[in-house]
UniProtKB/Swiss-Prot annotation:
SUPFAM superfamilies: YheA/YmcA-like. HAMAP family: UPF0342. Gene3D superfamilies: YheA/YmcA-like. Belongs to the UPF0342 family. It comes from Ligilactobacillus salivarius (strain UCC118). This is UPF0342 protein LSL_0473.
């Protein structure tokens, strides 16, 4: 009998070996090594976290949205931040593809058109 946990653990190991993961890991190290970029990175992550918390609570504050837009614009002035966002998009595509594969059996179970 197949143990899906063994498969999942192997997937985790394979993900760590993927080029997308290695690229992301490398650019995060560069961001952390550059004080100015890392400061903007932390500001952006904090603003994103605040926005996400408010969305979950259903209490979206316009000031938080505006602040996030301003910080995002500031971050776009830093080449390393732009590289980071590019690498985040690449790994996000990979993870989305993996999710589609993983959830395919469930999609088939609930498919009302088939």
């Amino acid at each position: 009998m197949i143990n899906v946990y063994d498969t999942a653990n192997q997937l985790e190991k394979d993900l760590r070996e993927s080029q997308e993961y290695k690229d992301l890991q490398a650019v995060v190290a560069k961001v952390k090594a550059d004080d100015a970029t890392f400061a903007v990175y932390k500001k952006l992550r904090e603003a994103q976290k605040t926005l996400q918390e408010q969305q979950m609570q259903g209490t979206l504050d316009e000031k938080v949205m505006k602040s996030l837009q301003e910080i995002s614009q500031e971050a776009s002035q830093y080449p390393l931040m732009m590289e980071l966002m590019e690498k985040e998009r690449a790994i996000s595509v990979l993870i989305d593809d993996l999710n589609k594969i993983i959830f395919k059996p469930l999609s088939e179970v609930y498919d009302i058109e088939g």
